[in-house]
């Protein structure tokens, strides 16, 4: 305990390491972190002095430069936080190897197969002129805050290629090929003890003295597959700004939706929503550290601090919560949105829960999804589904089917269906309370109606119309067809003059048929009362 206090006062113990060598964790002596950290201009104490807040402690080996001496001068409270500008960025997902067959006739001694060579390709974005160089089996050193790489042999260093500013540029250098037959198996991966990186891609900004000390570094390793082929996998990325090295870490839960060409169509139905995983309403804007899951809104994150200390995604304990908020300048164009998006429209509601005091004047907060991908227009090829109230019957399908005797007698089973027609010609949801009230009113009206109005006692051979049902004589009839309609003749005539009529078919009695609008002609014989 006393040694820790003494280190806080006297400073960090000097480490026996060369000034230009890369720093490795854990140190031989002393501590890397202190008992507190600064974030957003505020000071926070941590119960884990040697815990890396943005990842695992072993990730510090990719940082390279030595830690800052402590204690150091803290910025004033009124001094604003300086925003770092990244002038160049290499898209690590686009890093790949391209196979080339050796043009020479030389083949390996052990096998007669032709030798296969590989070159490196990737995409990058830059806001300034940049010079890109590839290094294989390289060592890392630091001089005046800049990373300097040197390979084991000059043949493992590519020529420097210069590019102008632009986005989505393709790096391809077929003249620099890698022959893995000359590599040992242990040289394909990163060796922490030796400090040798299998592949280093260094992009140095070369656009005048104003941007001196800016660079982007991509560290990668190689993998050998069962079939003998090789692939490259990114390890870490570093951004050097004003001769200070920063380690880039991924944020899980936010991605560039515009760069989805490489993904299969099976991922189209995956969960790409940007709502909070707890409340499922507000947009997610809070990052959980050190797992780096962006899955909470500000309100749910504040509640989670006092209820639990585990991430809702990976269930690992978290040590800090970081709210990330994007802002943009208020312009006349932002007042009239080009299109409407249900997800992005929640940003206006989300701002009500956020603290507006930290927003600079003249700016407005926007969602991270909109800041990364912009406003996505709604596809016109997918029409919106109409509501129940918007569906109207045009009457072109024939005469409407009127109520049968079973419905007139108040059988509620005949009124049930997936969609019931309302008096105004619209279809409402079966579970709608309005539909239930209409059914009850209709049943009460039908129960009060006289049974004589259902069907007259005598049906003449001529055409008669009874409640919208046309009676036509002389058509063949079948009892099986009447059963298929779900309506029996006895139910129609059971209340005629309060007497029950028999259903015995008589050849002398005229028959009346009930015709329904359908693709086939259905008829039902009814004996005259």
UniProtKB/Swiss-Prot annotation:
Keywords, sorted A to Z: Metal-binding, Transferase, Ubl conjugation, Ubl conjugation pathway, Zinc, Zinc-finger
Single Gene Ontology BP annotation: protein ubiquitination
SMART domains (alphabetical): RING
A Pfam family assignment: zf-C3HC4_3
Pathway: Protein modification; protein ubiquitination
EC numbers: 2.3.2.27
Biased composition (Polar residues): 449-463, 477-487, 520-529
Post-translational modification note: Autoubiquitinated in vitro.
Purpose of the protein: E3 ubiquitin-protein ligase. Also acts as a negative regulator of hedgehog signaling.
Top EC class, one word: transferase
Domain notes: The RING finger is required for ubiquitin ligase activity.
Species of the source: Danio rerio
Name assigned to this protein: Probable E3 ubiquitin-protein ligase MGRN1
Zinc finger intervals, RING-type: 275-314
Matches recorded under InterPro entries: MGRN1/RNF157-like, Znf_RING, Znf_RING/FYVE/PHD
One CC-aspect GO term: early endosome
Matching PANTHER family: E3 UBIQUITIN-PROTEIN LIGASE MGRN1 (PTHR22996:SF2), MAHOGUNIN (PTHR22996)
Catalytic reaction(s) noted: S-ubiquitinyl-[E2 ubiquitin-conjugating enzyme]-L-cysteine + [acceptor protein]-L-lysine = [E2 ubiquitin-conjugating enzyme]-L-cysteine + N(6)-ubiquitinyl-[acceptor protein]-L-lysine
């Amino acid at each position: 305990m006393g040694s820790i206090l003494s280190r806080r006062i006297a400073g960090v113990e000097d480490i026996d390491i060369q000034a230009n060598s890369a720093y490795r964790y854990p140190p031989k002596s002393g501590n890397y972190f202190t008992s507190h950290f600064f974030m957003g201009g505020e000071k926070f104490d941590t119960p884990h002095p040697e815990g890396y807040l943005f990842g695992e402690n072993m990730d510090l080996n990719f940082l390279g430069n030595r830690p800052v001496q402590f204690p150091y001068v803290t910025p004033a409270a009124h001094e604003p936080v300086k925003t770092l500008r990244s002038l160049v960025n290499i898209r690590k997902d686009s890093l790949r190897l391209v196979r080339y067959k050796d043009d020479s006739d030389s083949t390996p001694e052990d096998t007669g197969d032709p030798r296969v060579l590989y070159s490196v390709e990737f995409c990058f974005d830059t806001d300034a002129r940049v010079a890109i160089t590839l290094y294989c089996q390289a060592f890392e050193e630091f001089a005046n805050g800049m990373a300097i790489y040197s390979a084991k042999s000059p043949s493992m260093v590519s020529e420097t290629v210069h590019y102008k500013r632009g986005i989505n540029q393709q790096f391809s250098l077929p003249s620099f090929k890698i022959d893995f037959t000359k590599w040992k198996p242990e040289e394909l991966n990163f060796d922490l003890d030796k400090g040798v990186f299998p592949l280093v891609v260094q992009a140095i900004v070369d656009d005048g003295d104003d941007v001196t000390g800016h660079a982007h570094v991509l560290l990668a390793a190689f993998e050998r597959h069962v079939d003998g082929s090789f692939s490259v996998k990114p390890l870490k990325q570093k951004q050097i700004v004003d001769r200070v090295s920063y380690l880039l870490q991924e944020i899980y839960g936010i991605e560039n939706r515009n760069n989805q060409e490489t993904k299969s169509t099976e991922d189209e139905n995956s969960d790409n929503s940007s709502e909070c995983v707890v409340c499922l309403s507000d947009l997610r804007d809070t990052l959980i550290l050190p797992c780096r899951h962006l899955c909470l809104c500000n309100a749910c994150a504040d509640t989670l601090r006092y209820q639990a200390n585990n991430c809702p995604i990976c269930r690992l304990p978290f040590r800090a919560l970081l709210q990330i908020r994007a802002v943009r300048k208020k312009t006349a164009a932002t007042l009239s949105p080009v299109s409407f998006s249900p997800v992005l429209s929640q940003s206006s509601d989300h701002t009500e829960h956020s603290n507006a005091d930290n927003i600079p004047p003249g700016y407005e907060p926007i969602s991270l999804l909109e800041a990364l991908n912009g406003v996505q227009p709604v596809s016109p090829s997918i029409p919106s589904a109409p509501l129940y109230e918007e569906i109207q019957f045009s009457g072109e399908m024939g005469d409407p089917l009127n109520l049968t005797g079973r419905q007139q007698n108040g059988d509620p089973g005949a009124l049930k269906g997936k969609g019931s027609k309302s008096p105004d010609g619209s279809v409402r949801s079966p579970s709608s309370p309005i539909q239930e009230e209409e059914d009850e009113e209709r049943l009460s009206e039908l129960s009060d109606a006289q049974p004589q109005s259902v069907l007259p006692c005598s049906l003449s051979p001529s055409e008669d119309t009874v409640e919208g049902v046309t009676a036509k004589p002389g058509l063949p009839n079948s009892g099986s067809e009447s059963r298929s309609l779900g309506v029996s003749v006895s139910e129609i005539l059971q209340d005629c003059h309060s007497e029950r009529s028999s259903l015995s078919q008589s050849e002398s009695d005229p028959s009346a048929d009930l015709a329904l609008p359908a693709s086939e002609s259905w008829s039902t014989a009814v004996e005259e009362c």
